[in-house]
Amino acid sequence: MYLTSEKKEEIFSKHGKGKNDTGSAEGQIALFTHRIAHLSEHLKTNRKDYNTERSLVMLVGKRRSLLDYLMKKDIIRYRAIVKELGLRK
């Protein structure tokens, strides 16, 4: 598996409030961003993998929903996570 529990803990500790903070919006956005990057690399070599392409679109939608929630709830945290992850607004 490409995403081990150690890697998840690293992502959550870097972007969340702690390594076990799996519920914060920032941690989930960072995890989705990592998964999106992995699926994008997979699709570069496997262009006809339509199931993965659909999964990628669904993940992008989930991340967008979380970003919208964070923007409405706390604009400072939203701007920080967008800058930290290098996402477009």
UniProtKB/Swiss-Prot annotation:
A GO CC term assigned to this protein in UniProt: cytosolic small ribosomal subunit
Pfam hit, one: Ribosomal_S15
This protein's UniProt keywords: Ribonucleoprotein, Ribosomal protein, RNA-binding, rRNA-binding
Entry's Gene Ontology molecular function annotations: rRNA binding; structural constituent of ribosome
Basic and acidic residues bias: start-end ranges: 1-13
Region (Disordered): 1-24
GO BP, sorted A to Z: translation
Superkingdom, natural source: Bacteria
Gene3D superfamilies listed in its UniProt record: 6.10.250.3130, S15/NS1, RNA-binding
Function of the molecule: One of the primary rRNA binding proteins, it binds directly to 16S rRNA where it helps nucleate assembly of the platform of the 30S subunit by binding and bridging several RNA helices of the 16S rRNA. Forms an intersubunit bridge (bridge B4) with the 23S rRNA of the 50S subunit in the ribosome.
Family: Belongs to the universal ribosomal protein uS15 family.
Subunit and interaction comment: Part of the 30S ribosomal subunit. Forms a bridge to the 50S subunit in the 70S ribosome, contacting the 23S rRNA.
Stated name of the protein: Small ribosomal subunit protein uS15
Organism: Christiangramia forsetii (strain DSM 17595 / CGMCC 1.15422 / KT0803)
Gene name in the database record: rpsO
